[in-house]
């Protein structure tokens, strides 16, 4: 009786129920993809077990095993027109919603099913093949293993979820670590050794992780976490790495005491995602935004996204205008307002632990993005190229051919935009001279409407600067 309502809204795992924009679809529901089809498959398998329904068990196993694959791209030239199939790719990327890198959000939900479903159907006629297990291992090692820093999930891989109050990079990182702990003893010997070292290092860097594992359902996970921490034979380390994610238009440069990340977009991937009233000013999150993770582990966790100027994200070169915040659909929530560029030259290359990334950018909007006022326009005459050369202790950022012909609006490049300490008294040094800058206040609405006082301080002949960090070894 209690499962009838669930069965009514989801008679099979291949479709989703009539909620939000889905209510406009034929037959009242839409085809499920990626993490959503895994969630639906988990429901189907659970329904099958509770109702003793072999058809639900079969469909849940079939739908999910057909999704736990390594997605391939037969013709990359078609990505601009067709977008991506949702799921993991050979470079460790996870794509969802056609054009959005989502390893640190939907990718986590995807992998929760990768833990849950095998535990329900293992040892039954509907259990997975060995190939599915190999793919799940690949996601763990090449996806999660290269997308975190000291237990924090990289914000560049979280899509619109960065705008959520409860969606911190620490929270997402802990969810990923729980998944890894549940799977770690089923990995191959080499993968297990790598992930044991990685997990021990991450848990040591996030000492609150083990205590965060509350509830009866986490007893075994907490026990395994403590065993790893107390095992002296496991060396806690994460090797230096330069990782290019070409399918996501992302780069990760991980050294011993810092991680640098670049977030780009192209004709294949979006500038951001504005959806369900979330992330409505995320316009430039993938416009060459750069991240520096160091010993200040609260830098992007402690209210960074709801206080940073959305028009001056670090690393970006933009025309500072309000582009639009989406259009309400039948649900009443704003959707859209995000877009692709018309540029294909976006990507990178790797030599050992060094790497290069490049992005040709423009203000032209390739797809017909919409907001409440109609078709979106940004800065159609803006164009340029950005490059990042990443070495052991040095990052070189270059720009060339940057122009916005015929338009009076300025083009601004933001080198860095750091969260200061609670008193705002971080020491700022220019050419060896300590500078005391005035503290100003503004809200996001004022920034977007250009009514805030954003006048700065000019420095003539500045050759080098240093900003005191929040904690030791966190200066920039």
What kind of feature is each model-predicted range?
Residues 1-164:
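Aromatic-lined, polymer-binding surfaces characteristic
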Residues 110, 117-132, 136-476:
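Extended polysaccharide-engagement surfaces of secreted carbohydrate-active enzymes
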